[in-house]
Swiss-Prot record:
This protein's record includes keyword Transcription regulation: no
Keyword Cytoplasm: yes
Protein name per UniProt: Protein GrpE
Major localization class: cytoplasm
């Protein structure tokens, strides 16, 4: 019988945690909770950053969509404006009555150009400039030895841009040096 009580006191001693063991367990739990809190905090900050990035991206996309919508609307006005400019160019060759009408149309044309300016649309001149495929479309090439190759000889349609970005490239005639084979065959014919 004496053995039984000894066994139970040993069991009691092992089942009751010592203050050192209890402290270690609490410290471990504390470390685990801190790590979990840090992980949750990191997730929260990541979600917050993603939400902010999404807001910025949506704001930028909305601005770009509005800009492209304005550009497309303005592009639709370019052909009639250019036609009006050409027609007004001939107004000086007509009667006084037509010249008076032309003054009114000139005012309307100026209003259109003012709207374009307010929206940041500017026309650019190409004649005499070097050909730039970003700003020009070569619709005609003329062989010449008097003008440097790549120089724009004539502008058929004006180019327009907003900032540095063209919204319509200029259609131009570009100078090109004659091919060497062509000059040899011309000399043989003579």
């Amino acid at each position: 019988m004496t053995e039984t009580p000894n066994t139970s006191s040993e069991e009691i001693q092992t089942s009751e945690p010592s203050p050192d063991n209890e402290l270690q367990v609490l410290q471990q739990e504390n470390a685990n909770l801190k790590a979990e809190l840090q992980e949750q905090n990191d997730r929260y900050l990541m979600a917050l950053a993603e939400a902010e990035n999404s807001r910025k991206r949506l704001r930028k996309e909305r601005t770009e969509m509005m800009q492209y919508a304005v550009e497309n609307a303005l592009m639709d006005f370019l052909p009639p404006i250019e036609s009006m400019e050409k027609a007004l160019g001939f107004a000086s060759q007509t009667s006084e009555e037509v010249k008076n009408w032309a003054i009114g149309f000139q005012m309307i044309l100026q209003q259109f150009k003012q709207i374009f300016e307010e929206k940041g649309v500017v026309e650019y001149s190409s004649k005499g400039e070097l050909f730039n495929p970003y700003l020009h479309e070569a619709v005609e090439i003329e062989e010449t030895t008097t003008i440097p190759e790549g120089t724009i000889l004539e502008e058929f349609t004006k180019g327009y841009k907003i900032g540095d970005r063209p919204i319509r490239v200029a259609k131009v005639k570009v100078a090109k040096l004659p091919a060497k084979g062509n000059s040899d065959s011309n000399e043989e014919k003579e």
